[in-house]
């Protein structure tokens, strides 16, 4: 297995980096999704091959992308997913918006844990749904779900947006937390499928 140097500093100057454009200010960017380590060599190599063609037009998904995604879920989670049920969406916020538009109605209440990644909270509101925020508890240097508050919010909601790792806290919800949510709050449902 290749050893990677995670201490190597790579300048982001001239790359239009969203998190470093304000570097003249006294701030430390702590993004969750924008890491400061290089991607794996094999990815750089494959992109270099594609770059040699010199054409940067629109592309289509490969014919087997759904099958590859289904195999990944099976391999990593022992979850057998019908490849035809996998839908491509280029960004998480758009995927959340599409879900909201297709599985809830204007005026419906949707629960989210806070603090929250603002673009996802905004997706609830811009789609004319009511955002119910359940504040996380900060205890002993980590965040916890306030299950009493969450249960109260669930009584008024038809949908729950769960993000793990949570953004912006970086919290990865434990299996116990996920089971408690799934078992306790199964009334948040689609016609035959639980949303939690």
Positions of PLM-derived features:
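Conserved small/polar residues in nucleotide/adenosyl-binding loops
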Residues: 186-192
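Conserved core of the PLP fold type I
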Residues: 56-182
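N-terminal small-domain helix-loop-helix segment of the aminotransferase-like
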Residues: 2-91, 98
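Hydrophobic pocket-lining residues within nucleotide cofactor-binding pockets
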Residues: 35, 136, 190
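Short, solvent-exposed loop/turn segments at secondary-structure junctions
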Residues: 33-37, 117, 166-168, 194
């Amino acid at each position: 297995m290749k050893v990677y140097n995670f201490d190597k500093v790579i300048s982001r100057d001239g790359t239009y980096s969203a998190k470093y454009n304000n570097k003249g200010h006294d701030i430390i960017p702590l993004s969750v999704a924008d890491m400061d380590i290089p991607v794996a060599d094999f990815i750089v190599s494959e992109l270099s091959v594609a770059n040699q063609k010199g054409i940067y037009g629109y592309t289509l998904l490969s014919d087997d992308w759904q099958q590859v995604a289904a195999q990944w879920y099976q391999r990593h989670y022992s979850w057998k997913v019908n490849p035809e049920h996998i839908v491509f969406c280029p960004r998480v916020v758009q995927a959340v918006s599409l879900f909201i538009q297709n599985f809830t109605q204007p005026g419906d209440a949707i629960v989210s844990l806070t603090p929250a990644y603002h673009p996802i909270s905004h997706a609830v509101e811009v789609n004319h749904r009511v955002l119910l925020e359940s504040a996380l508890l900060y205890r002993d240097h980590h965040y916890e779900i306030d299950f009493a508050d969450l249960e109260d919010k669930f009584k008024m909601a038809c949908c729950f947006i769960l993000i793990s790792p949570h953004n912006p806290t970086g919290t990865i919800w434990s299996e116990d937390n996920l089971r408690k949510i799934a078992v306790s709050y199964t009334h948040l449902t689609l016609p035959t499928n639980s949303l939690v």
